[in-house]
Each structure stands twice: as structure tokens, then as C-alpha cells.
UniProtKB/Swiss-Prot annotation:
SUPFAM superfamilies: 4'-phosphopantetheinyl transferase
Gene3D superfamilies the UniProt entry points to: 4'-phosphopantetheinyl transferase domain
Gene Ontology annotations for the cellular component aspect, listed alphabetically: cytoplasm
Keywords: Cytoplasm, Fatty acid biosynthesis, Fatty acid metabolism, Lipid biosynthesis, Lipid metabolism, Magnesium, Metal-binding, Transferase
Species whose genome carries this gene: Sodalis glossinidius (strain morsitans)
Lineage: Bacteria, Pseudomonadati, Pseudomonadota, Gammaproteobacteria, Enterobacterales
One Pfam family it belongs to: ACPS
GO biological process, one term: fatty acid biosynthetic process
Protein name in the entry: Holo-[acyl-carrier-protein] synthase
EC number: 2.7.8.7
Length: 126
């Protein structure tokens, strides 16, 4: 397998907290898929949940080589977790088109968070 894209993003959790304080759920609705939105509403650490999802989606958009633009939206990426909490990624719409163009057959996601930051790396391979 060959790496066809890699992206990393780091998010200052305090910045996400400030946006949520100012605008309520607007940011969450802009970046979360419907399934993520349901999880978000039941989560006990809303800001941390949102910051981690944001970091993964930014990293994934960078791995596709585009960033969030030209028809690519945060909601076209969905972060899922297995029973042990290991993150994975589902793609929709334009994200699928771009991944297919690159010949993506495998995806890897790593996610870390500490007190002030959330960091994610996404690798696409073929």
C-alpha cells in the first residue's frame, strides 16, 4: 500500500469553547454529521467532543489535498469509534469523489487530546 494523502490538524480547545459560548450549537450543526449530532447532544464534554471532530475533519480534508472548500464540507466526514474507542472515518458525497480520484482503499485516523489541545492525523492509502 502507498500513502496518497496525509493531513494533521491541531485545535485549541479554548477557541472552540469561545465559539460555542458566543453562538451556541451553530458550529456543531455546521461540522457534525447527523449521527455525530446525536452523540454530541448526549455527550458530557461537548466542547472537547466538538474540538476532536473538528480536528479529524480538517486533517482529512488536508489529506485529500483540498481543505474544506469547492463543495467539500465538514459534514461529508463522519468520525466513528469502535468498542474500544479507536477512531475511524466515513466519507460522503464530494469527499467520496475526491477519495476515489486518489484511489483511496484504506484510511487511518489517530486522535489525541490534552487539557488545551486536540490533535488528529489522517492517512489515506491505496
Amino acid at each position: 500500500m502507498a500513502i496518497v494523502g496525509i493531513g494533521t490538524d491541531i485545535v485549541e480547545i479554548g477557541r472552540i469553547e469561545a465559539v460555542v459560548s458566543r453562538s451556541g450549537d451553530r458550529l456543531a450543526r455546521r461540522i457534525l454529521s447527523p449521527d455525530e449530532w446525536r452523540q454530541y447532544q448526549q455527550h458530557n464534554q461537548l466542547v472537547r467532543f466538538l474540538a476532536k471532530r473538528f480536528a479529524v475533519k480538517e486533517a482529512a480534508s488536508k489529506a485529500l489535498g483540498t481543505g474544506i472548500r469547492d463543495g467539500l464540507a465538514f459534514t461529508q466526514f463522519e468520525v466513528c469509534n469502535d468498542a474500544l474507542g479507536k477512531p475511524s472515518l466515513r466519507l460522503f458525497d464530494q469527499a467520496v469523489v475526491l477519495a476515489n480520484r486518489l484511489g483511496v482503499t484504506g484510511m487511518h485516523v489517530t486522535l489525541a487530546d490534552e487539557r488545551h489541545y486536540a490533535c488528529a492525523t489522517v492517512i489515506f492509502e491505496r
